Amino acid sequence: VHLTGEEKAAVTALWGKVNVDEVGGEALGRLLVVYPWTQRFFDSFGDLSSPDAVMGNPKVKAHGKKVLNSFSEGLKNLDNLKGTFAKLSELHCDKLHVDPENFKLLGNVLVCVLAHHFGKEFTPQVQAAYQKVVAGVANALAHKYH
């Protein structure tokens, strides 16, 4: 991902304020509600029968936190996203058979959740930088599929 120094600083500064527990659970929950076909990858998560069930599901929250912790690792290695996410790409491709388009969907949902949480602080410039990052992460996670 090519970010300017200013973009990197903006992404890093905002990310330092992110509550990964809260934002991770909300982002994954919203993905499962807005794009219900993604639920098929989470059969073991129990009740996903309604938006309230999804958003209150402790397994969704826990996995969302795990996802954002991985995303945090990516932010520390923006110049080597493919290397950073190589094992996760392999897992999601070979074992879990996740449609790589879902990585893009989750990235876009994450941007929406960040905008919701940070309001005016999430300026168009910050959003543009985050869109680059989530696209880079989605591309890195899809790398094994190519």
Curated annotation (Swiss-Prot):
Q: What does the UniProt record say this protein does?
A: Involved in oxygen transport from the lung to the various peripheral tissues.
**Upper taxonomic classification of the species?**
Eukaryota, Metazoa, Chordata, Craniata, Vertebrata
Sites of the modification S-nitrosocysteine? C93
**What UniProt keywords apply to this chain's record, in alphabetical order?**
Acetylation, Heme, Iron, Metal-binding, Oxygen transport, Phosphoprotein, S-nitrosylation, Transport
Q: Which residues carry this modification: Phosphoserine?
A: S44
| Tagged with keyword Heme | yes
This chain belongs to the protein called: Hemoglobin subunit beta
Gene Ontology MF terms: haptoglobin binding; heme binding; hemoglobin alpha binding; metal ion binding; organic acid binding; oxygen binding; oxygen carrier activity; peroxidase activity
Q: Where does heme b bind?
A: H63, H92
**N-acetylvaline: which positions carry it?**
V1
Q: Which family does it belong to?
A: Belongs to the globin family.
Q: How does it assemble?
A: Heterotetramer of two alpha chains and two beta chains.
GO biological process entries? hydrogen peroxide catabolic process
Tell me which residues bear Phosphothreonine.
Answer: T12
Write out the transmembrane intervals: none
Pfam families, from UniProt?
Globin
One cellular-component annotation, GO: haptoglobin-hemoglobin complex
Modified residue annotations for N6-acetyllysine: K59, K82, K144
Summarize tissue expression: Red blood cells.
Q: What are the Globin domain coordinates in residue numbering?
A: 2-146
